[in-house]
A protein has these predicted regions:
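Generic alpha-helix initiation/capping and coil-helix boundary signal
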Residues: 7-8, 16-17, 131, 190, ...
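Active-site-adjacent "subsite" loops/lids of carbohydrate-active enzymes
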Residues: 157-159, 164-165
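CBM-like carbohydrate-recognition segments
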Residues: 22-134, 148-153, 165-169, 284-379
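Short gly/ser/thr-rich secondary-structure transition/capping motifs
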Residues: 157, 221, 347-349
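Short, charged, amphipathic alpha-helices and their helix-cap/turn boundaries
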Residues: 138-156, 197-199, 203
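Extended ligand-binding clefts on enzyme/binding-domain cores
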Residues: 165-288, 293-304, 316-345, 357, ...
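Fungal secretory targeting signals
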Residues: 1-23
């Protein structure tokens, strides 16, 4: 939990709140194993792989996540530690087009970078210290983001490669990678990267947030989505949460006190605005503040995960009653085969997943929620 005197403001609203007792019933290990197996099976796009890798890290190897302990992590790991994460990241790097700077060449700027944290972890903990394949792949991905990808005139990196277009999704994909790179690099170069990650969050907020406290999904470019898409708001809040966790656990945390306060406030804006629209059974709607939208378990799960993480870091328990309801809703929305039901189709944004079709990112969000809840209970 944040302790530095300059960061007391982060938890100021929690001063009158005692930590609540657990009100959510924990999802069983057997169910989580099924959810995980299904996630691995259907995660094929770059952002799905990156999100799945983050979910595996937070759930199975929490001490190696940006929420789990000091950064950088140990350079030498016990045999078998994070083997599933390392093997998947290795597979991506081995399959990388040698003529591409991005880890996967799929037309997006932000999405391939979502795999970057796991590639950096693989490089940091590699047993063959002469192997520079992973450091090269990560450096090329960073170079593409910072030096080649299109930007707005004030410096916001585009989420798309073919035109300048800002998506809320970007904050989960690229800034956490930039920040993690900085935390591992350290020194003045690392500090610059951590500040770059923060600055991207700041710029995106300026473009996407409106007076409701919620974020629009997509702005600029040849088309826009000005609705308050639940998953978009969840991506943004969760991405900023990862950047905050990275800064907080880095050796440079004391040099970025204001940035940590800002990020905490910006995350709280989204979760506070979102839970105002929670429905009686615990769900949020796909378009959060639109009564004619439909229930979406995906965004509900990720926003709940963020809220547990925020409570663990700051001691602010003001939304725990809401996220406990959300956790129970997610538990009841996972079927006997480990599939999360009642999700939005992640590629249309505006329609439910069809019968027999499931959301890869939704599967990951269940694991991220479960990991965040376990960490919250432990703290």
């Amino acid at each position: 939990m944040i302790q530095h005197p300059a960061l007391i403001l982060l938890a100021s609203w929690a001063a009158t709140c005692a930590a609540p007792t657990a009100a959510a019933s924990i999802i069983s290990d057997a169910t989580i194993d099924k959810v995980k197996s299904n996630m691995i099976q259907i995660s094929t796009h770059s952002w799905e792989i990156g999100t799945a890798l983050e979910a595996l890290t937070e759930l199975e190897w929490p001490s190696l996540s940006v929420f789990g302990g000091p950064l950088p992590p140990p350079a030498k790991l016990p045999s078998g530690t994070a083997s599933d994460v390392i093997e998947w990241a290795t597979k991506v790097v081995k399959a990388k087009d040698p003529n591409s700077l991005t880890l996967i060449d799929d037309g997006a700027v932000g999405d391939p970078a979502s795999i970057g944290v796991s590639v950096l972890l693989t490089n940091w903990t590699r047993t063959n210290r002469n192997d520079d394949e992973f450091s090269t792949a990560a450096a090329q991905q960073l170079t593409y983001l910072l030096d080649i990808a299109p930007r707005t005139s004030d410096g916001a990196i585009s989420h798309r490669a073919e035109e300048v277009q800002l998506w809320a999704d970007f904050l989960y994909m690229a800034p956490p990678f930039i920040a993690y790179y900085g935390a591992l690099e350290g020194g003045s170069g690392g500090l610059n990267l951590l500040r770059t990650a923060y600055q991207q969050c700041k710029l995106y907020r300026q473009y996407l947030r409106d007076s409701s406290g919620l974020w629009k999904h997509i702005v600029l470019g040849s088309w826009q989505d000005n609705h308050h898409w639940g998953t978009g708001n969840a991506w943004a809040a969760a991405g900023m949460m990862r950047v905050l966790g990275t800064i907080h656990h880095s050796k440079l945390a004391s040099e970025m006190l204001k940035e940590q306060i800002d990020l905490t406030s910006w995350i709280n804006e989204i979760v506070s605005a979102s839970w105002k629209y929670q429905h009686a059974n615990g769900t949020l709607f796909n378009y959060i503040d639109e009564s004619d939208s439909f229930a979406d378990s995906s965004s509900t799960a990720l926003l709940a995960a963020v809220t547990y993480r925020l409570a663990s870091l700051t001691g602010d328990y003001s939304h725990i009653w809401a996220v406990d309801k959300a956790y129970n809703l997610i538990k009841s929305s996972v079927d006997s085969n480990g599939w999360l039901l009642n999700t939005v189709d992640p590629e249309t944004f505006s329609t439910p997943s069809q019968s027999g079709s499931y959301s890869p990112e939704g599967q990951s969000f269940v694991l991220l929620l479960h990991a965040a809840y376990l960490d919250y209970l432990a703290k």
